[in-house]
Regions:
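Acidic/polar loop-and-plug regions of large Gram-negative outer-membrane beta-barrel proteins
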Residues: 234, 239-241, 246-320, 345-385, ...
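Short strand-turn segments of transmembrane beta-barrel domains in outer membranes
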Residues: 154-155, 167, 171-202, 212-223, ...
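N-terminal periplasmic "start-of-domain" segments of outer-membrane beta-barrel proteins
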Residues: 39-72, 96-101
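Extracytoplasmic beta-strand/coil segments of soluble accessory domains associated
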Residues: 32, 78-123
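Structural signature of Gram-negative outer-membrane beta-barrels, strongest in the C-terminal barrel
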Residues: 391, 410-423, 428-430, 436-456, ...
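Short acidic/polar hinge/loop motifs at secondary-structure boundaries
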Residues: 123-152
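Gram-negative outer-membrane beta-barrel transporters
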Residues: 491, 596-614, 620-698, 712, ...
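Repeated loop/turn-to-beta-strand initiation elements of outer-membrane beta-barrel proteins
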Residues: 178, 206-209, 244-249, 331-333, ...
Length: 763
């Protein structure tokens, strides 16, 4: 298929999906509006000062229920986001480390710089783009999840710190419905077993509780390593209803180990990606039983040995308090508090060079063939081994609001709030390099005249010019007062909000030399940054089924580690200018119900000004971006048929060069049909993307081909309380590349086909 056809076909498919849904909606427009699959009248609480329905808000908001999440057959928490219009989720990193953004805002180095991941309305981590410590690593979707609320743009700029692009809020169950469930899932053709549970009940007339979680074990769909998947999460809460509101205690403990997936060696010729013999990017991990212990340096200059096969190991223990009270005089007080201890270790294998013929005299250094001659292909395996010493976060968000009725029938709602956060960013980086057999099936380490006896090429500060043996100890204290003023009369509502963020950064960072952290290399962190954000919007409801909205916003994302170790020697001790990443947005759209069809259409423009440093490419960048487009979310339901879909069309560019930002596709589309047939429900979640460019200007300019991935499921009710399920991720086993890498022939891909079966009992 030609490159032009690769670009045209996804556009045509997306347009056809949208037109098909619209046609069906018109054909059955006489059906009752209670089939509103987008739930436009549902109360949402994310990115808003006071809860209101989607139909009455001037924001673009999506809600995803548990049924839709299960239908999507996600492989991790960020994979769920691929089904939401306007969200770009590169969720091919395994148990975490996803790249997430919205509406053409750039992903310059990794993580989720412009989007805030929340759990029950508070940030998981204040920064979304800390290298080797992203918020999705500390999130797990399990039986405790009630729903997902996703705000793109809008008032996220003023109702969250570091959230100018949007807010992704994982909302937990709180025990409103007594009962529970137990379920077990097992991989078919691969080793992974998982147990999920949840239970709600009453402790008294006004006291209820909820507890839920999961435990899993195995190797995962890529058969990464023995016990590469192992862990558990337990979440619980107790709610005490009082006459004027409620008080809730929240608890969470997470201890999880999962594989990480880096770009795999590939061939790149004239910008075209292709597989290498023996390496399938859909299954490659380069974890293996033939690894040696990886010896690294601690901040105290002692040696630490790690099992490379541990992959991503995260621990999170949190405690929170939430209260909402109606006070005298019509005032309402809302407060949320949470403190979390977050830590772990990130270990993955990254190709440090291109695959080539092994040098003469190369032998197996590990494995059953140790000592035998090796004459095949090899590459340099760079082990990213980063200790997340302390990513703890403590947050309190309190707000006071009141609605004032006016003589002319209008209402004025005022809200004043204060957000306070203390975020620790303490990590220890170590990169070691080994010579590895070029295969994705339990590769061994190799030895020759350029390695030591067990295959190590370079260790510690000898790797990549000594760039990446690092110690970071930062503390970021953020204080953010905010205010919201809303006015409503009849069909028209207007709102404006302001936020004043102040961030005080303290601590130090150190780059080792000669395999030691030396006091004279310590650099101070000691600066204060301020930023004022705004958001103004309006919504006009033409009738109960149609509303128009518009909004203009300005917000920012503060920097943390991404401006440390800059080759330009940017001082962070308060003596120089510390950059802030700024976003300005304009958006407007329509919300419409027509019988069984619900539609949410938003036009948007976003301008971004950012600074960044990427450790893997060792490049410092400062760019302005401009992105315009349209996102469409639609849902249709009639009887046993349900279809949800969406399409996002984005025209983004780097202002200085006119180039499209790396990995930014013109079109991304989703389609999720399902059909109920007696006791059975069958369906699919289809996600596709047009082609995009990557690694521009690196010498390996690459076209990431268009692809469509189909996840399918079938559920069968066994009696009244049991459900058997069969799910397939990537049904057609498509090879979908999500990124390449500057300066070397490597690319990361989504997982290949995997099948799982499950049984769930509700009680």
């Amino acid at each position: 298929m030609s490159k032009r056809m690769n670009a045209i076909v996804p556009n045509a498919v997306a347009l056809a999906c949208a037109l098909t849904v619209a046609h069906m909606g018109s054909a059955w427009a006489q059906t009752a509006a209670n089939n509103d699959t987008l739930k436009l009248d549902e109360l949402v609480v994310t990115g808003t000062a006071s809860g209101a329905s989607k139909m009455k808000q001037s924001n673009s908001i999506s809600t995803v229920g548990v049924d839709q999440i299960l239908q999507a057959q996600p492989t991790n928490s960020s994979d769920i986001l691929r089904t939401i219009p306007g969200v770009r989720a590169e969720s091919s990193g395994g148990g975490g480390n996803a790249n997430v953004t919205v509406r053409g805002l750039p992903i310059s180095a990794g993580g989720a710089r412009y989007v805030q991941f929340q759990e029950d309305g508070l940030p998981v981590l204040l920064f979304g783009d800390v290298a080797f410590a992203t918020p999705d690593m500390f999130l797990r979707a399990d039986g405790s999840l009630e729903r997902l609320e996703v705000v793109r743009g809008g008032s996220a700029s003023t109702l969250g710190t570091n959230a100018p692009g949007g807010i992704i809020n994982f909302i937990s169950k709180t025990g409103e419905e007594p009962g529970g469930s137990m379920g077990v899932t097992t991989g078919l053709g691969y080793d992974e077993k998982r147990f999920d549970f949840d239970y709600s009940g009453k402790l008294g007339e006004k006291t209820r509780f909820f507890v839920g979680g999961y435990a899993n074990m195995g190797q995962g769909p890529r058969n990464a390593s023995a016990n590469g998947v192992q862990g558990h999460q337990i979440k619980a809460n107790i709610t005490q209803d009082v006459d004027n509101g409620f008080v809730r205690l929240n608890f969470k403990t997470l201890d999880d180990k999962s594989p990480l997936f880096m770009p795999a060696p590939v061939s790149i010729k004239n910008g075209v990606l292709s597989e290498l013999p023996g390496i399938d990017p859909r299954k490659a991990t380069f974890y293996s039983p033939y690894w040696v212990q990886d010896a690294t340096l601690s901040k105290n200059n002692t040696l630490v040995n790690s099992n490379v096969n541990d992959g991503l190991r995260v621990k999170s223990d949190s405690f929170g308090v939430e209260t909402e009270l109606k006070l005298a005089g019509g005032w309402k007080l809302s407060e949320k508090f949470r403190t979390s201890e977050n830590s772990g270790r990130f270990i993955s294998i990254f190709p440090g060079d291109d695959v080539a013929n092994a040098a003469s005299g190369t032998k197996y250094a590990t494995g059953p063939k140790k000592g035998q001659a090796y004459t095949g292909k090899s590459f340099t395996a760079t082990v990213f081994n980063t200790s997340m010493d302390d990513m703890g976060s403590t947050t309190n968000d309190v707000k006071l609001s009141k609605t004032f009725a006016q003589a002319d029938g209008s209402k004025i709602t005022t809200t004043a709030g204060l957000f306070v956060n203390v975020q620790k960013v303490a990590l220890t980086w170590n990169f070691n390099q080994y010579l590895m057999e070029a295969t994705d099936n339990n590769p061994a380490l190799l030895a020759n005249s350029k390695t030591n006896s067990y295959g190590a090429i370079d260790l510690g500060t000898n790797v990549w010019g000594g760039c990446c043996t690092r110690a970071i100890d930062g503390t970021y204290r953020t204080t953010s007062p905010y205010a919201v003023l809303g006015w409503e009369k009849g069909a028209l509502s207007l709102d404006g909000s302001l936020r004043a963020d102040q961030q005080v950064a303290t601590g130090s960072y150190n780059q080792a030399s000669n395999n030691q952290f030396k006091p004279e290399n310590t650099q101070a962190i000691n600066y204060t940054k301020n930023f004022n954000s705004y958001s103004f919007g309006g919504n006009y409801q033409l009738d109960k089924d149609t509303a128009l909205f518009a909004r203009v916003s300005k917000g920012a994302a503060f920097n943390a580690d991404r401006i440390m170790f800059d080759p330009k020697k940017m001082p962070l001790d308060g003596s120089g200018v510390v950059p802030i990443n700024e976003v300005k947005q304009v958006e407007g759209g329509v919300k419409l119900r027509n019988g069984n069809l619900s539609t949410f259409v938003t036009l948007f423009n976003a301008k971004t000004d950012e600074s960044n440093y990427d450790a893997t490419t060792q490049k410092s960048t400062s760019n302005k971006y401009d992105a315009s487009g349209v996102e469409v979310e639609a849902g249709y339901k009639m009887g046993a048929i349900r279809i949800n879909g969406g399409v996002t069309v984005t025209d983004a560019k780097i202002v200085a060069t006119g180039l499209t930002p790396n990995r930014q596709a013109k079109v991304v589309y989703q389609l999720s049909p399902s059909y109920v047939l007696g006791d059975a429900t069958i369906g699919a979640a289809i996600v596709g993307t047009s082609s995009s460019k990557d690694a521009q200007g690196s010498g390996y300019d690459v076209t990431l081909p268009a692809y469509t991935v189909i996840n399918a499921f079938a559920n069968f009710n066994i009696g009244k309380n049991a459900v058997a399920s069969l799910g397939v991720n990537n049904l057609t086993n498509v090879l979908g590349y999500t990124e390449s890498n500057d300066g070397r022939m490597a690319a990361r891909a989504i997982n290949g086909r995997s099948i799982k079966a499950g049984l769930k009992y509700n009680f």
